[in-house]
From Swiss-Prot:
Family: Belongs to the bacterial ribosomal protein bL12 family.
Keywords, ordered alphabetically: Ribonucleoprotein, Ribosomal protein
Full protein name: Large ribosomal subunit protein bL12
Transmembrane segments: none
Functional note: Forms part of the ribosomal stalk which helps the ribosome interact with GTP-bound translation factors. Is thus essential for accurate translation.
GO molecular-function terms, A-Z: mRNA binding; structural constituent of ribosome
Quaternary organization: Homodimer. Part of the ribosomal stalk of the 50S ribosomal subunit. Forms a multimeric L10(L12)X complex, where L10 forms an elongated spine to which 2 to 4 L12 dimers bind in a sequential fashion. Binds GTP-bound translation factors.
Encoding gene, per UniProt annotation: rplL
Record-linked NCBIfam families: L12 (TIGR00855)
């Protein structure tokens, strides 16, 4: 008579923690294996597993040489008034927009760089 995987799982589920530990030790001894978790070699592999970023912050680093054009671009992008946009540009580096998607962040960066600003997307 053959035992199914489900029957084995049910039997293990009914065991106490000590019984499971003894079972694991017996399996390690019988099959010559170790139940220790495998160690992943290399830090680069771990870095590749990080989720892709979906929200970005657009940071105005500096206004550059054409401050008036940058203020106009900031007003158009954010809907701020003239005074608020000027204060934001004068206070650079400052966050311009936060939590936007990649396409919007790239479009905003291109628009501001065209006006002469230095912009970072993080």
């Amino acid at each position: 008579m053959s035992i199914t995987n489900e029957q084995i799982l049910d039997a293990v589920a009914e065991m106490s923690v000590m019984q499971v530990v003894e079972l694991i030790e017996a399996m390690e001894e019988k099959f010559g294996v170790s139940a220790a978790a495998a160690v992943v070699a290399g830090g680069a592999a771990a870095g590749a597993a990080v989720e892709e970023q979906t929200e970005f912050d657009v940071i105005l680093e500096s206004a550059g040489g054409n401050k008036v054009a940058v203020i106009k671009a900031v007003r158009g992008a954010t809907g701020l008034g003239l005074k608020e946009a000027k204060a934001l540009v004068d206070g650079a580096p400052a966050p311009l927009k936060e939590g936007v998607d990649k396409a919007e962040a790239d479009a905003l960066k291109a628009q501001l760089e065209e006006a002469g600003a230095t912009v970072a997307v993080k």
